[in-house]
């Protein structure tokens, strides 16, 4: 299966680096995108996860955020169209959710932050499934229009995905 993963933050770089390695071990073809963000790019490099840098964050200004997000959507659409993934996975990346939806690619969201209203409003309704820690009640997600059967909960907090790989020095 060909899987597209979009990584936006240092936490996501840690989380998805382990995730990418496991998917590859199971024979999946993975391609990763990120936006221009020095810490994310460095973490992905340290963790041997190749990523294509597409776009940047618009900063604190709402207008700049909107413009940069729009540019990134257009650039991602072009890139992803060429790659032809079977599914997309992101930690609620608005651009990944929008591009996947627009291209008819199922988007699977991972999120532990139902309080991040803007991001959730832009991603959850476009996602086929939401994966979230069991500590977050399903009811916290319902206001974003996702049906309870489409919410999968796991028994861990997200750092558990990468912390176990490190032995005390």
Show where each model-derived region lies:
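A nucleotide-sugar donor-handling region in carbohydrate enzymes
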Residues: 131-169
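Conserved nucleotide-sugar phosphate-binding/catalytic loop shared by glycosyltransferases and other
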Residues: 24-68
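A conserved, positively charged/aromatic
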Residues: 108-109, 120-132
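Short amphipathic alpha-helix
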Residues: 10-24
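Active-site proximal beta-strand in glycosyltransferases
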Residues: 87, 101-114
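Short, well-structured alpha-helical segments in soluble
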Residues: 72-84
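Structural motif
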Residues: 2, 86-87
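Nucleotide-activated donor-dependent transferases that construct or modify glycoconjugates
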Residues: 1-10
